[in-house]
Amino acid sequence: MNMGLFYGSSTCYTEMAAEKIRDILGPELVTLHNLKDDAPALMEQYDVLILGIPTWDFGEIQEDWEAVWEQLDDLNLEGKIVALYGMGDQLGYGEWFLDALGMLHDKLALKGVKFVGYWPTEGYEFTSNKPVIADGQLFVGLALDETNQYDLSDERIQTWCEQILGEMAEHYA
């Protein structure tokens, strides 16, 4: 099983999370791709995709993702296992918290992918409904807030990595 971790990062937080995820899952399994430098077409060569997207300003897509957003429509991702993680500021921008994560999830849902890594909303304060499912009980991916809950990020990343490994194993069983 080969995993490609694709991310966009303007302030390095999404990139730092990518490196932590790679280190936990294993550098022999996970290859990092900064969308600033690498084409999204590379996603097609992986069995598993981990995609990191921060939300900018008032619910906007980060610039590296925005530059390749339309290219995602042309990719063949049918049957791929996809785990998402997002970065945002739940207190300063609660009504747009992780909107980009929700937009990416909705875009990929049309591509026939299998999602893993939904994450509980408990412990977060926000009002946006874009990044949630299950009557608001789950985020569509790991939710990270380096502005207000940086002290929880390492534990959340560790727990989420264990969770997605278990869910991936079920898909391959």
Curated annotation (Swiss-Prot):
Keyword NAD carried by entry: no
Cofactor(s) listed: FMN
Single annotated GO MF: FMN binding
Superkingdom of this protein's organism: Bacteria
Statement: the UniProt record of this protein carries the keyword Electron transport: yes
Domain Flavodoxin-like: 3-165
Bilayer-crossing regions: none
Protein keywords: Electron transport, Flavoprotein, FMN, Transport
Pfam families tied to this protein: Flavodoxin_1
Family: Belongs to the flavodoxin family.
Function per UniProt: Low-potential electron donor to a number of redox enzymes.
Protein name per Swiss-Prot or TrEMBL: Flavodoxin 2
Species: Salmonella typhimurium (strain LT2 / SGSC1412 / ATCC 700720)
